[in-house]
Amino acid sequence: MPASSLLPPTLLPHRHRLRLPPAGCSTSSSPSATRYDFDPLLSYLSTTSSSPSPPPTSVLPVTESRLAASYAAVPAREWHALLRELAATDASLPLAFALLPFLHRHRLCFPLDLLLSSLLHSLSVSGRLLPHSLLLSFPPSLSDPPSPLLLNSLLAASAAASRPAVALRLLGLLREHSFLPDLASYSHLLASLLNTRDPPDAALLDRLLGDLRESRLEPDAPLFSDLISAFARARLPDAALELLASAQAIGLTPRSNAVTALISSLGSARRVAEAEALFLEFFLAGEIKPRTRAYNALLKGYVKIGSLKNAEQVLDEMSQCGVAPDEATYSLLVDAYTRAGRWESARILLKEMEADGVKPSSYVFSRILAGFRDRGEWQKAFAVLREMHASGVRPDRHFYNVMIDTFGKYNCLGHAMDAFDRMREEGIEPDVVTWNTLIDAHCKGGRHDRAIELFDEMRESNCPLGTTTYNIMINLLGEEQRWEGVEAMLAEMKEQGLVPNIITYTTLVDVYGRSGRFKEAVDCIEAMKADGLKPSPTMYHALVNAYAQRGLADHALNVVKAMRADGLEASTVVLNSLINAFGEDRRIAEAFSVLQFMKENGLRPDVITYTTLMKALIRVEQFEKVPVIYEEMITSGCAPDRKARAMLRSALRYMKHMRVA
């Protein structure tokens, strides 16, 4: 039977490759005239590529040994040509990776690391991504030790495939084998973080920056730009500003898109004065002419603080400078009008937008809908939809995602599912944001069984699961105390090449702590530290609060001490939980000592602080002290809330009852 008939259908296009010369043919003919038949080899590899790792060469089957001997005369360039052909399609790509160890075992071509690096480079040049399954299953190198060339090639492929966890492991291997990572390694890793939908994880960025400084590599302007962009997207404008200053100190100017990202981050943090100063320094006072995106970043800040006058002035200045506003510009202004309750002004702006030749898209209407959502006016979602249809604009995936989120936030799960069904009826495929929003809404609405059903439907739809998806499910399973499910979900997340972020670890600490599984909660913090990540104040607060709920004041105090040992200052929120822990344990003196500590360290007690102290006093029946604390709260400028007033009434009622008795 011909060898080509043994090949799977997906590999038949490769059967025409070079043929072996017939017996008796002169071997002195030019290589280009020589033909080699690779059909038997491809057929053999197609049946063995899914098998476990092959045995050492000394115990290889006779078939493979004979097959290898028949290809001993094939020159290196022909192996390269075959690899390129196999890498040309996703169907035959696994076969290309099966060929590499075959060549290595029989020493048929030069070092495997170089071959693999060449293959990865070919994929990169063609703009194709290395399949995730291959990234996870293929070893970093089939040689020992691995070469830095191969590790960097795999790192770049992992980054291109948006698999930062795999890229991080490869960076760790570089350091483990005492190879000095180059700037490209960090650039590739930052690219993988910036190419994801979610903001980069702050702890991961800190770890990367620390590693870069430890390696004593001097970042160039592109790497500084990537670092600034990453920290800005992670909502860490102070770190981004520090990096900007470091770049300027050595005479480097970051790319304009990095500066724009930083202006946007400052605006989002309501630090508009700093955003203005940066805009003036780099764009108006500098040699770089501001583009639409830079103006939009500044405009975003004005919208955030509700400064409509300044927002409108930005549009005027753009017109004077000859910079055309785009859809995002108008969207931000429409958003500002909607948030200010000026729906008619928003409608007028939509007409101006069309007059300027910028047709409003679904995104503009999604911003209007988001404005109503944030103002609590979810019922106006239907009016926005009507206005859309009147303007001849069809809802897209993003609009439906905002609509589902709007209904989900106000527990209108029926409307959310209707929007989801309508979306699919219109041929719009839900993405990871759609599924996450819908699953999370059902979790928060207490519909856990339905949330799990939706998660299963998401899997069946082949929609890729993201870190946020796993975080939602870990929280759900933790609330139901399904601990095996929690561990399985975390393991699956890592197997998919996703990096557990600060939210993942905080969720784990919270669900373990609230269930009294304190050992597991502490283990999570230690595991995070072992991974080189820094626990956040939120994580420590979750653990302090968990101990407080069970009256374990000493344990809560130890967590606060550990927090300070890690260089984190305890916030008012954390110390309020510590006061609650002492109160639950009936240790009033210690509870008031925390109040004194707050005053001495410049932390302003809030209404929760005083309410928690009043609750502690009532618990130990020191009712007469409650009015004193209530008076101190008012004197300090804290407005009593309903709970504080209820505490006072309760104490006064007990005091009156005791006097009567």
From Swiss-Prot:
Q: What is this protein called?
A: Pentatricopeptide repeat-containing protein CRP1 homolog, chloroplastic
Primary role: Required for the processing and translation of chloroplast mRNAs.
**What does the UniProt entry say about where the protein is found?**
Plastid, Chloroplast
Task: State the species of origin.
Answer: Oryza sativa subsp. japonica (Rice)
What are the entry keywords? Chloroplast, mRNA processing, Plastid, Repeat, Transit peptide, Translation regulation
Q: Name one GO biological process term.
A: mRNA processing
Entry's Gene Ontology molecular function annotations: mRNA binding
Q: Which cysteines are joined by disulfide bonds?
A: none
* PROSITE patterns per the UniProt record, alphabetical: PPR (PS51375)
SUPFAM superfamilies linked: TPR-like
